[in-house]
Every structure is written in C-alpha cells, then in structure tokens.
UniProtKB/Swiss-Prot annotation:
Encoding gene, per UniProt annotation: set-23
Classification via Gene3D superfamilies: SET domain
Organism the protein comes from: Caenorhabditis elegans
Lineage: superkingdom: Eukaryota
Entry note about domains: In the pre-SET domain, Cys residues bind 3 zinc ions that are arranged in a triangular cluster; some of these Cys residues contribute to the binding of two zinc ions within the cluster.
Protein name: Probable histone-lysine N-methyltransferase set-23
Length: 244
C-alpha cells in the first residue's frame, strides 16, 4: 500500500492546466440549490440528489455546485455537493485472505441504495502517460480506470490512475454481481470525477465491489475471477490495450 493519499482526483502528466481549469460558470442561488429553485448547475432541470443525499439516476449529466457558485457562501450545506465532500460512510480496508485478490473494502456500517460510497480518486493522466506507465509497471496490477463518454457523437476518454496517488477507492474489487456502481460527476469542471454509489442496500461487513466492465482478452492471458457470485463470468474484465 505504498502510495500517496489524496482526497480527490488531481491533474497528472498529460493533462494541461488549461484543460484542468476548464470550469463551469457557477450558480447564483441564494437559497437551496434545487431544480425547483432554478439552480443553473442542474442543467437537466432535475435534482441530482434527494434531500437525504441519494443519487437521482434520472439526471443524465451530473454537475455538482462548486467554488464558482454563490451557494458556497450559504450557511447551510448545499444539497448539490456530494462526491466532492468525500466518504460520509465508514469504510474499512481489509485483507481478503486470497493472494490473487489482495485487499478489499467493506462497509463499516449500513449503506442504503443510492448513497455515495467514495470517489475513485487518483491522477488524471493523458493517453501517452497511460501507455508509459503500462510499460513501466508491466506485470503489476493495472489500476487505471478509463471513463468513456460521448459528446457530439464522438468518444471521449478520461484516465484516472491511483497507483501513485489515490484514495480508498483503489482497493475496491471487481464483482460480476456488484453492490456498487460508478457514476460520473462533474465537480465544477469539464473533466469528470468517478463517484462510486451503492446499487442496493449494503449491510455492515459486506465487501464493496463494482463491475470493472467487459473483457476484450481471450485465451491464456485471461485471469480467473474470484467474485464467487452466481452470475460470475469466470474471468476478470481486461482490456486489449492500455487505453481501452
């Protein structure tokens, strides 16, 4: 576990200062930030979160309020700030006692469906840096998370690597039947953050997992999946190239 701990994703090699500082214009809310109040950060005219902080999956583009917003001066906490506030639930790193699986994360208390677990935080890096690190750490576990989106019909990829700098999110294991999922959130800037939310109610002591995605690897290079769920696909999802 030799890495630098950070609270949220930071810019790394391959990400220009201009791209990282491409921020949204903030809202001018003087009261609660909600769709009913006309908060400009809620561009879908739908609240991103319920009053008790659960994710509203009807929101197609999740933009949280930020330091550019007038609501930062409000005496009460803005309802449209969840991912940026970090984990609010007790999370525990533990040894899974399986050498191939290593460490994992479990719930230290009950987590309700839709509640925020943690961000998958690391360095936001460029494609060339992804490929360079893949060569440098060849044979080691690959921590890089590829966030895939489409804008104007064109694919856009964001790479988050917590190998050197990261948070507890780097320890969440894969499951073919996960209790968590990744939802992209924009925390005042165009570059998204990876928020991990509970897909269903989770009991204390239960391991937290999300689905790493579909595999593009066939044959001998595949690794066995150890999730032990009834829907197990037998092999871990793996990309054919570092930037997929």
């Amino acid at each position: 576990m030799n890495y630098e701990k950070i609270d949220s994703t930071i810019p790394g090699p391959g990400i220009s200062e201009t791209d990282w500082n491409d921020v949204f214009e903030g809202c001018n809310c003087e009261a609660e930030c909600s769709s009913a109040a006309g908060c400009s950060c809620l561009i879908n005219k739908i609240d991103n979160y319920t009053v008790d902080g659960k994710i509203n999956k009807s929101s197609e583009l999740l933009i949280e309020c930020s330091d550019q917003c007038a609501c930062i001066l409000l005496p009460t906490s803005c309802r449209n700030r969840v991912v940026q506030c970090g984990p609010q639930k007790k999370l525990e790193i533990f040894s899974t006692c399986e050498m191939a699986k290593g460490f994992g994360v479990r719930a230290g208390e009950q987590i309700a469906a839709g509640e925020f677990v943690c961000e998958y935080a690391g360095e936001c890096i460029g494609e060339q840096e992804v490929e360079r690190r893949c060569r440098e750490f060849r044979g080691d576990d690959n921590y890089t998370l590829t966030l895939k989106e489409f804008f104007g019909g064109k694919p856009v990829k964001t790479f988050v690597d917590p190998r050197l700098r990261g948070n507890i999110g780097r320890f969440l294991n894969h499951s073919c039947e996960p209790n968590c999922e990744i939802i992209l959130a924009r925390l005042g800037r165009m570059i998204p953050a990876a928020g991990i939310f509970a897909k269903r109610d989770i009991v204390r002591g239960e391991e937290l997992c999300y689905d790493y995605g579909h595999s593009a690897i066939e044959g001998e290079n595949r690794k066995l999946c150890l999730c032990k769920s009834e829907k197990c696909r037998k092999y871990l999802p793996m990309s054919a190239t570092p930037i997929e």
